[in-house]
Amino acid sequence: MIIVFLTLSTFYIALLLLQPALPQPFMALFKTLPIGLLIVMVLKARSQLQNRTFITLLLALSFSALGDVLLALDTGQLFIGGLAAFFVSHGFYIITMLPIKNWRLDVVLLYLFLAIIVFCLFYPNLNEMLIPVLFYMLVLTIMASFTWMTDKSNGFLVLGGAVFVISDSILGLNRFYLEIAHADIAIMGSYYLAQFCLVKGFLQATSKHK
């Protein structure tokens, strides 16, 4: 399953180098295939997952796939739809990590500090995107922080949260601050790694608690 995931992820990233050779709908399809495989991984692990974890993971990945499609088809107007889809996705990841019992103020402050720095760079160019981006950064910060504090916490979860922050920071900087060479490669490579680590982390945590 890991080999297939790596193959699908690498294939899409390679396709990015060919743009605009493929029409947007095809790019959107290939973009979502690695996330579709993660959904299959969760479905195969159904017997080892609690009902809430199973449902919230499926919803988190499904909204991620929707966000992928909207961003792949983005002509400007669909960006906020993609942002909203990922906002909901992070919300379901957060629910999956509840309850939080091991509060870590140092982790929260670190992620808040990083979010403030990045937001200050975005701010002059956000305009009507100010509120949506602010709320998205807040939920992303909470999700990444919770990977340290949930009783399901493990190396995969922590890495997944951190790499998701890196991926979205590159995306935001490229869109709202300055154009970054080969940003799409860096964004998608880190994004696929983050999603894989989050799913792997949740599945590993569930196995550990059985």
List where the protein language model places each region.
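Polytopic alpha-helical membrane-helix bundles and their juxtamembrane interface segments
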Residues: 1-210
